Amino acid sequence: LTMEFYRRNYIEGLFLSSGVLKSPNYTMELLYTVLYKLRHEHNFQGYIHVKAIPGADSRLIQMTGYLADRMSVNIELPTAESLRLLAPHKTRKNILAPMRFVQQMSAENQYEIQTYRHVPKFVPAGQSTQMIIGATPESDYQILHVAESLYKKFDLKRVFYSAFIPVNEDKNLPSVKEQRPPLLREHRLYQADFLMRFYGFKAGELLSEDNQSFND
């Protein structure tokens, strides 16, 4: 399907993601296999953004990174506390580990490219992440500080924000009946993120302890 769309110029690239099937290594190997076939068997030259699976062997992530343009590890929620509340099977440490590995591999690859000829590129478009907003009580101020820290510590190219959309009732989640997706809030965070990435604004210059929300 991807190659049919690509040949007809319907698409210029592919975003490939997956939930964990059987195990992180099994899932990461499946993602690698898809990318390998696209690049080497079908000569796909388009843009590929692939997800790295937390808990997968670093060798699998490395092999996949040489076939992708961008790689992402979703941080899921703004804080470790929220992650423990809503996704206790996941840990912040487990999520940040592949993010750090991709950063280190990218830095090493940049050095190799400058030193040697014909070195394959590792995720040349960098890495990104995504966090869900509105499912937990963090303020815009807290969320921007998390994003700012991720940009600094992991050399991220983008942080994506996804407005929480309730689909079922859960005592730990906002009510399906009362909660609307915070789309305006998502939009404001993207605007603030743009100011931080392109104009060098700090989170503390956009919001403060006394004013923690863009909608107040």
Whereabouts are the PLM-identified features?
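Conserved Radical SAM active-site core
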Residues: 1-129, 134-137, 150, 168-178
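Intrinsically disordered or highly flexible coil/loop and linker segments, enriched in small
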Residues: 11, 108, 156, 198-205
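Generic secondary-structure boundary/loop-capping signal
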Residues: 80-83, 161, 193
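Flexible, glycine/charged-enriched surface loops at secondary-structure junctions
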Residues: 111-117, 161, 201-208
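A conserved active-site cap/scaffold subdomain adjacent to cofactor or substrate pockets
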Residues: 129, 140-184, 190
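Long, highly charged, low-complexity intrinsically disordered interaction regions
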Residues: 169-216
